[in-house]
Amino acid sequence: MKIYADNAATTKLDIDAFEAMKPYPLEDYGNPSGAYSFSKKAKRALEKARKTIAECINAEPEQIIFTSGGTESNNHAIKHYTVDSDVKHVITSPIEHHSVLYACENSGAEVLTVPVDKYGTVTLDSFAEVLCRPREVVCSCDSHLVTIMMANNEIGTIQPIKELASCGGAVFHTDAVQAVGHIPIDVKEMGIDMLSASAHKFNGPKGVGFLYSRNGLLQPYHHGGSQEFGM
């Protein structure tokens, strides 16, 4: 008998999700951007999925960008926002996923690291200290980005995202790959500006993820293509 106990790494595809997907690779495979009925059927399915995902986190459908997974979502949120908005400082923690840490290092902004306590928690005091240290450098900057993981896949720590996001007025991104589908998330109530997720972490297919982005926050970076709002 096979016993699998690493659902923090990946999960089994849910049979209902599998059945819902089945028609599209072989039967209803039209290009969603096409103008004819075959494509429009695929478009309806795509937008239904977008609406379902949006409802799960209390977002609007047009705020959901489908991606290939958490790594792409994290890189897109961090690297493209820092460039588009001329971000000077990115504030993060030392226990983030490598796709966050390396994206921060390659964002062109200065990286400020918030220490965690013995439980892996980013405390409000330590966060506020880094956010405003030195005050004349960080807090006077109109444009800086915070990226803190919502739930850690190795030690299970759930960060106080709502409280952290309410500090300082910075744009707030969270890597919620380990959280979506497992704990309640309300991006409006929690003050989240951008959120990354990956379907295979909550019984969805591999190679599929999404990025939630508050309206007007990110600029298109795929020029010449119409899929996913050019994002």
Model-inferred region functions:
Residues 1-231:
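Pyridoxal 5′-phosphate
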